């Protein structure tokens, strides 16, 4: 965040401007990285500076032309997009042709501005990465973008290995036994509860569970209730599987992740013989409940209930049974067999992260985002604008008070997860001028603008059409991650019609309607398309629907305004005042900045504002 002195410097149209551009380049011939330094007018750092005694050659023709958007261009709401721009270097003499032998893509670049003097007096107006170079006969254009690509990666890479513990040739076999090779473990019960498969020879293509193992005789005993169909002998080849890391059928499958408070997720069955399931690759806060065909495993202190929710709503006590949880590994084991789909309610990830020194469970949107980007995205605390997260955490009732949950059963992209979590509550994320992750949410303009623009600064203004005010807003909440159909449900659930209906609907919808005669004022007004959230409480979903209707259920102004001003003073979501003798702006109107295009070479800013 800029200091007051830096903002005052940018506001001073007469203050001298020197732009410094520093970027890393990889020498394809020498296989080494070096930093290159350029400026608008030529600059050399002093011996006490860092970097010291470094000359910034005066080749910068256009220091920075960059576009930043809250959402996709032309849209209000939806998924976040990265900032893009260009920097142009003068190459009339061909001196920069050497850059053809360098790789810039994915390397860091920063642009600073200052009046000269000490290098430390310059400050960042852009920190990001480079894409590629475009050439002309007179200039080099470097395409730049923010650091959003750092999060364009898999959220989880840990996979099940389907570990084979040992292979060999049997020495003998019986009805429910097999004598392993002499090289097998000498530790009693070493292979207990592991699976053994006859992979060749006599008894080929049979698989059984080992229930005991004698390390002295090498005899593995299998379940007597499932004897060998064909007894193994000394020609039988075998493999013993350690299912603690998933059955062989799960080999290379990405392990699941569970964050916050989720309902009816489908766990991964890692060991069918032992009825063992995994909900998260790591420790969790609690496995709240387990269901077979929607029928919760446990009992109510009075009456016959299919789930704890209804039991407790009627004032009784629910007791879980029928499964054994292991919160340290994010797994549970069923006591008995099940023939219907297994689901679970879970309070997920309980671990340490850059903001929590000890293992901690978190369930607020901002906290989940910080956990994901630091533990899975590789973002350091220094790369996060914590003040923006502090503001976001209290920006709306649903964000402040609502618990959310997100389940990733088979891997996925971090950006997709962030888009789902943040945009579902009307939020956005980006990277700041300093290269730090920023989060925010579109709300009503603030009462006090950070800048005001009048006819003296406004070069052009264009009014854009906006959506017709909505009649109502609806949110989907309390998501059931398994989409149930009638064929999935246990018999007891089928006869519990209200509960059955909830399972089949997947979401609990909350609608909020406008009260200002919208249908009379706007004959084509319609209800907004439903937004599905990850809130675990429909009451917070109601608050979010209400907020959205108050935001989108009234007439709005949307302008594209080009102003003659010093760039880099504004940010996305800043509040500005537009005052002009047009469009009903005579008395000035506070509006939110939803997009910015800044051109340092012309000292112009084009912004899209909503109010």
Describe each model-derived feature in a short phrase.
Residues 291-294:
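Short strand-turn-strand beta-turns centered on an Asx-Gly dipeptide
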Residues 130, 210, 593-595:
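Conserved hydrophobic positions within beta-strands
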Residues 1-2, 10-13, 20, 24-37, ...:
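C-terminal extracytoplasmic interaction modules
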Residues 138-141, 147-192, 197-262, 298-325, ...:
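Small/polar beta-strand repeat architecture
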Residues 119-136, 207:
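Beta-strand-rich solenoidal segments
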